[in-house]
Amino acid sequence: MPKYFCDYCDTYLTHDSPSVRKTHCSGRKHKDNVKMYYQTWMEEQAQELIDKTTQAFQKGKMGNFGGLPPNGMMMGPRGPMPMMPMMPVRPMGMGGMLPMRPVPPAMMGGGQVMMMGPRPGM
């Protein structure tokens, strides 16, 4: 029967069954090893980026960060900010509710139009 090898923990599991792998992968030591692996990998990637940037800067391939920006990159003076429309202020006694509008008598029946008959006495 083949054994399962965990690359993160650098160990063989006793059986190659899904339940054994699931138990192993949910363990604290395995999770710590996975976290450490990816943390180390990210640190290596960051260091490579730093090294490449340093080499490019030393070779003169990076732009000059000091002084004035290239022509056309200067920003002129800014004008005033446009005013945003203000919401009307309601008195505090309203409690945040919108004012109620009277419902037309023809629309009172659950959204169905009610037919108005002749008035009594006509």
UniProtKB/Swiss-Prot annotation:
Q: Tell me which SUPFAM superfamilies the record gives.
A: beta-beta-alpha zinc fingers (SSF57667)
Q: Where are the zinc fingers (Matrin-type)?
A: 4-36
Name any GO cellular component annotation: U2-type prespliceosome
Q: Which GO terms describe its molecular function?
A: mRNA binding; pre-mRNA 5'-splice site binding; U1 snRNA binding; zinc ion binding
The record ties this protein, via Gene3D superfamilies, to:
Classic Zinc Finger (3.30.160.60)
Quick one: where is this thing mainly located? nucleus
UniProt feature coiled coil, ranges: none
Q: Keywords in UniProt for this one?
A: Metal-binding, Nucleus, Ribonucleoprotein, RNA-binding, Zinc, Zinc-finger
Q: Is Signal among the key words of this record?
A: no
Any keyword Ligase? Answer: no
Report the superkingdom from the record: Eukaryota
Q: What subcellular compartments does it reside in?
A: Nucleus
InterPro entries in the record: Matrin/U1-C_Znf_C2H2, Matrin/U1-like-C_Znf_C2H2, U1-CZ_Znf_C2H2, U1_snRNP-C, Znf_C2H2_sf
Q: Which GO terms of type biological process are on file?
A: mRNA 5'-splice site recognition; spliceosomal snRNP assembly
- Disulfide connectivity? none
The record's subunit annotation is: U1 snRNP is composed of the 7 core Sm proteins B/B', D1, D2, D3, E, F and G that assemble in a heptameric protein ring on the Sm site of the small nuclear RNA to form the core snRNP, and at least 3 U1 snRNP-specific proteins U1-70K, U1-A and U1-C. U1-C interacts with U1 snRNA and the 5' splice-site region of the pre-mRNA.
Q: Which family does it belong to?
A: Belongs to the U1 small nuclear ribonucleoprotein C family.
Q: Which HAMAP family match?
A: U1_C (MF_03153)
Q: What is this protein called?
A: U1 small nuclear ribonucleoprotein C
Traced from the root, the source organism's taxonomic lineage reads: Eukaryota, Metazoa, Chordata, Tunicata, Ascidiacea
